Amino acid sequence: MTVPAATKASDCKPGFGCVTNLPLPRFVSLKGDEGNARRGPGLTHRIDWVFLRPGMPLKITAEYEHWRRVEDRDGAGGWVHYSLLSGVRNVIVTLDMAEFRETPDLRSRVLAQAEMGVIARVLECLPDWCRISVEGEKGWVAKTALWGVAADEVIE
């Protein structure tokens, strides 16, 4: 079997995908209503998991041709075709009644709260906080209450 030059391990930079040359791991979101996670990168591989939440954040950990190895916040996952994924940045709230604040400061006024499991759009992130949006509500939430962004990630 011949391996395409773009996927040879020797051609890959550490910490970057061999196919896209984008950082690994990185976060994306589920594009449609459902996405099959397969045991291996191809349609002939068994479906191990089905993601059913539109916009769900997923972590890409590997790439092979048109396939991306992804996992959810619980570590469940598999290989998903890249067309089922979006670069739109979303997070999932991991703390019950996470507080949306007016500014990225614990002394700031609480504008709203979100239940655990809510999926939110990322508007921007600082080292310890992200400004997110859910159903028209916007506010700053501590990163420790979110999954879908790296601890040190800054998003403008």
Which role fits each region the language model picked out?
Residues 2-39, 50-54, 61-64, 71-76, ...:
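SH3-family beta-barrel domains
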Residues 46-47:
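Beta-strand-rich domains and repeat architectures in extracellular enzymes and scaffolds
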